[in-house]
Amino acid sequence: RTCPYAQRARLIIAAKGISADLVNVDLNKKPDHFFDLNPYGEVPVVLHNGGHVYESLIAAEYLEEAFPDPPLFAKEALVRANERIYFNHATK
């Protein structure tokens, strides 16, 4: 079973065609070093350019900003808001 929060990151990585190594973490047996990446021990954690980002929505925004092409959302504000609503429902 995949965590819905980690699924957000996976969906964005797939939609944007980002080359990534996906690592599954056993949420019942998290390795100690995982807490160095996220003090809360939650997924996802995105490692990129020597840094790391956690919290699923912040990670999603980071991936959109770090990999702008292709854009994940439309340019028009109302269309973009509706896309985010759909995305939010799809990843709950």
From Swiss-Prot:
Q: Which reaction does it catalyse?
A: RX + glutathione = an S-substituted glutathione + a halide anion + H(+); L-dehydroascorbate + 2 glutathione = glutathione disulfide + L-ascorbate; methylarsonate + 2 glutathione + H(+) = methylarsonous acid + glutathione disulfide + H2O
Family matches, as Pfam families: GST_N_2
GO CC entries: cytoplasm
Q: Which Gene3D superfamilies match?
A: Glutaredoxin
Q: Enumerate the residues binding glutathione.
A: 30, 43, 55-56
Alphabetically sorted, this entry's keywords are: Oxidoreductase, Transferase
Q: Keyword Transferase on this protein?
A: yes
What triggers expression? By treatment with KCl and serotonin.
Which part of the chain is the GST N-terminal domain? 1-71
Q: Name one GO molecular function term.
A: methylarsonate reductase activity
Protein EC = 2.5.1.18, 1.8.5.1, 1.20.4.2
| Record keyword Ribonucleoprotein present | no
Q: What does this gene product do?
A: Exhibits glutathione-dependent thiol transferase activity. Has dehydroascorbate reductase activity and may contribute to the recycling of ascorbic acid. Participates in the biotransformation of inorganic arsenic and reduces monomethylarsonic acid (MMA).
Q: Into which family does the record put it?
A: Belongs to the GST superfamily. Omega family.
The protein's matches in PANTHER family, at most eight in alphabetical order, are given as: GLUTATHIONE S-TRANSFERASE OMEGA, PTHR43968
Protein name per UniProt: Probable glutathione transferase
Q: Which organism is it from?
A: Aplysia californica (California sea hare)
Q: What is the lineage of its organism?
A: Eukaryota, Metazoa, Spiralia, Lophotrochozoa, Mollusca
